[in-house]
Swiss-Prot record:
Residues 210-213 are annotated as: G4 motif. Keywords: Cytoplasm, GTP-binding, Nucleotide-binding. One of its GO terms (biological process) is defense response to virus. It comes from Solea senegalensis. This is Interferon-induced GTP-binding protein Mx. Residues 30-303 form the Dynamin-type G domain. Residues 40-47 are annotated as: G1 motif. Residues 141-144 are annotated as: G3 motif. Residues 504-527 are annotated as: Disordered. GTP binds at residues 40-47, 141-145, 210-213. It is found in: Cytoplasm. Belongs to the TRAFAC class dynamin-like GTPase superfamily. Dynamin/Fzo/YdjA family. Pfam families: Dynamin_M (PF01031), Dynamin_N (PF00350), GED (PF02212).
């Protein structure tokens, strides 16, 4: 470790301190930070590895001993300096004077967070250790993976633990440190399987083999094959360590002495000595590798971390703008605050009706929806006209028999023409009214959405605006329906300017003639039309189609104009007028400005988030 500290003194500690500082700010609530998460099946030797790295005893025993994520922050001090410890969780922070007290303090913290028993919690405990005997390193210890619930444990304890582990190791910023006992088949290790699920390429997974002294004679080569990456490939590779066994703990073998025993074990081992020579064995070498891996991972993650902080900060600031600053306490200022709120809303309703950008920031556009609806109306008129033309061919002879009077053949019966035109146009009235109701409902929803956005956090203002929007919608819809029905009553007067009608009739005759020529030729057409009364009927059909074309064009414009004028322009103006009149009642001000209790909490949360993100940005800029 001396060589490591000399080589990376200016690099290692600042990198790790930076991430620790960001984590202590609570930035991990907002984005993922580079970390090393330690996972392993129960009895894999995970606690022993952490004890060897930290130099302090951690909770151990049968069953689940790690019941909360434990952030283990180790800081190397100069030789001769004293040991320091600190534990913090929730709102509690406590200095630890004696390394022997660490285990007890962690157990107390777990009881406070996860309760008495064997339940687990996602809330983290932070343990900080400063000593000349520890590496510059931060690890997150996670509960050991269990398969079967024992007495007192929830039936789904295994699923709870896996869910907690996945929450940490799914982040690309997390290095997975998988602890595995040498005397257990690697393929059955659940911790490694979970790491492979989240990191299938093995790019951010490091394997740690423990308990090499328990390997059966003759199977040493299998362990070496794993360490040489020939069994399950991990890009970060494998390390092997020998920590204190249960017997050594009972014999009170110190951690320092255990390190010396470990060194002798590997150096003198017939099969594992090569691993020691290659730097793949012992806790000190593991500490060195982990430190370098973490520093490299931090440096690699910093550019993306800066981007994430800027993104999250921008999002939080934009969200805070939506919630606003809250109403002031001074009565006069409260009135001005209300006026500003209502004015901004009413101006946005006018802007919405005009298709302009809104001050509230919402991307609401009614005209794209209106355009689609009015296009549908135009298509409906066209389709109805096509059906009318097809029906004319079948029914015109019937109408001729029914309504023809004393006229000689060749004279068009105007009454027949009028009856058929009126009947066809009358069929368009209800579809026009339905189109009005559909659009009225769409406009109402957008106005309600605008009110919700403009008066976020003020439920009484929202309710008042909604009530007015509903009332105005009914009034304007009734007026618009009356105008549409009047329009259709006027359409019962068969009328068009002579020039307009003559042009339409001429165009229709030209189209019919061209169509007939394409089908049978002009000579045959003329001969057939002169044979009998068919010529009269053909003439009547031309008149019917010509007039419907004029009337449908008139309705294609008039119906949308009525709807748009009443449901948009007039509704917006009336809403603006009524909202302004509402503010004349000064006694109503306090009722309208009563804020939603949750909004104050959300605003405080956002302000806190912005504060810590700005601090985090400052830390990164200074780094």
């Amino acid at each position: 470790m001396t060589n490591l500290n000399e080589q990376y003194e200016e690099k290692v500690r600042p990198c790790i301190d930076l991430i620790d500082s960001l984590r202590s700010l609570g930035v991990e609530k907002d984005l993922a930070l580079p970390a090393i998460a330690v996972i392993g099946d129960q009895s894999s030797g995970k606690s022993s590895v952490l004890e060897a790295l930290s130099g302090v005893a951690l909770p151990r025993g049968s069953g689940i001993v790690t019941r909360c994520p434990l952030e283990l922050k180790m800081k190397r001090k100069n030789d001769g300096e004293g040991w320091q410890g600190k534990i913090s969780y929730q709102d509690h922070e406590e200095e630890i004077q004696d390394p022997a007290d660490v285990e007890k303090k962690i157990e107390e913290a777990q009881i406070q967070i996860a309760g008495v028993g064997v339940g687990i919690s996602e809330n983290m405990i932070s343990l900080e250790i400063a000593s000349p005997d520890v590496p510059d390193l931060t690890l997150i210890d996670l509960p050991g993976i269990t398969r079967v619930a024992v007495h007192g444990q929830p039936v789904n304890i295994g699923e709870q633990i896996k869910k907690l582990i996945h929450k940490f190791i799914t982040k690309q910023e997390t290095i997975c440190l998988v602890v595995h006992a040498c005397n257990v088949d690697l393929a059955t290790t659940e911790a490694l399987q979970m790491a492979q699920e989240e990191d299938p390429e093995g790019e951010r997974t490091l394997g740690i083999l423990t308990k090499p002294d328990l390997v059966d004679k003759g199977t040493e080569q299998m362990v070496i094959d794993i360490l040489q990456n020939e069994v399950i490939h991990l890009k970060k590779g494998y390390m092997i360590v020998r920590c204190r066994g249960q017997q050594e703990i009972m014999q009170k073998v110190s951690l320092a002495e255990a390190i010396e025993r470990e060194k002798a074990f590997f150096a003198d081992h017939a099969h594992f000595c090569s691993l020691y020579d290659d730097g793949q064995a012992t806790v000190p070498r593991l500490a060195e590798k982990l430190t370098l891996e973490l520093v490299h991972h931090i440096e690699k993650s910093l550019p993306r971390l800066e981007e994430q902080i800027e993104e999250k900060l921008e999002q939080a600031q934009a969200e805070l703008v939506r919630y606003g600053t809250g109403p002031p306490s001074d009565a006069a200022e409260r009135l001005y605050f209300l006026i500003d709120k209502v004015t901004a809303f009413t101006q946005d309703t006018i802007s919405l009706a005009a298709g302009e950008e809104l001050r509230c920031g919402e991307k609401l556009n009614i005209f794209s929806a209106l355009r689609r609806e009015f296009d549908k109306w135009s298509i409906h008129l066209s389709h109805t006209g096509q059906k009318f033309n097809a029906r004319i061919d079948k029914e015109v002879a019937i109408y001729e028999d029914k309504y023809r009077g004393r006229e000689l053949p060749g004279f068009i019966n105007y009454k027949t023409f009028e009856v058929m035109v009126k009947e066809q146009i009358k069929q368009l009235e209800e579809p026009a009214v339905k189109k009005l109701r559909d659009i009225a409902d769409a406009v109402r929803k957008l106005f309600l959405q605008l009110a919700q956005c403009s008066f976020t956090g003020f439920p009484n203002l929202v309710k008042t605006a909604k009530a007015k929007i509903e009332t105005i919608k009914l009034e304007r819809e009734s007026t618009a329906e009356s105008m549409l029905r009047t329009q259709f009553k006027m359409e019962m007067i068969v009328y068009s300017q002579d020039r307009t009608y003559s042009n339409s009739l001429s165009d229709r005759k030209k189209e019919e003639s061209e169509e007939e020529e394409r089908r049978k030729g002009p000579k045959l057409h003329k001969e057939r039309n002169c044979m009998d009364n068919h010529a009269t009927l053909q003439e009547l059909m031309l008149h019917l189609k010509s007039y419907y074309n004029i009337a449908s064009q008139r309705l294609a414009d008039q119906v949308p104009m009525v709807i748009r004028y009443q449901m948009l322009q007039e509704s917006a103006v009336q809403l603006q007028r009524q909202m302004m009149q509402m503010m004349q009642d000064k006694e109503n001000m306090e009722f309208l400005l009563k804020e939603d209790l949750n909004i104050g909490c959300k605003r405080a949360t956002l302000q806190s988030r912005i504060k810590r993100l700005m601090k985090a940005r400052a830390y990164l800029m200074e780094f």
